[in-house]
Amino acid sequence: MQSSPSTLGPGRAADTCQAPPGPERPPVARARAVASSLGPASASGRVPRGLDMSAQETPQGRRFPIEAGDSPGLASAPESQDSPEPVATDQNPVRPLRRCPGCHCLTLLHVPIDVYLAMGGSPRARAT
């Protein structure tokens, strides 16, 4: 008896998978198993609104680049005109700001010295 190319026995070199052979499943059952592993929305054949990657709009450009220590969630959040003051929560702590003695600029508190120097800060001591 001659075996057909579709029924390869164990030990044939045509299959490159190293896993032991399992029971054959019809394509419909295989598709159902894949859909059920992806969740209920995919099993029904519909993609939930908002998750379709082709329908998403391109995000608006940020004004400033993300820097070390910035939260990715804060960087992509759109600014709203409703609340000019950001609200501190557990997920997005607000950086403390302080006015310098001349009252003309805001400074960040608790900036590590290496970050300050890397941003062009002067290594000399400040007069207080």
Curated annotation (Swiss-Prot):
It comes from the Eukaryota. Signal peptide: none annotated. Residues 1-96 are annotated as: Disordered. It holds the Pfam family UPF0731. Belongs to the FAM229 family. PANTHER family: PROTEIN FAM229A. This is Protein FAM229A. The lineage of its organism: Eukaryota, Metazoa, Chordata, Craniata, Vertebrata.
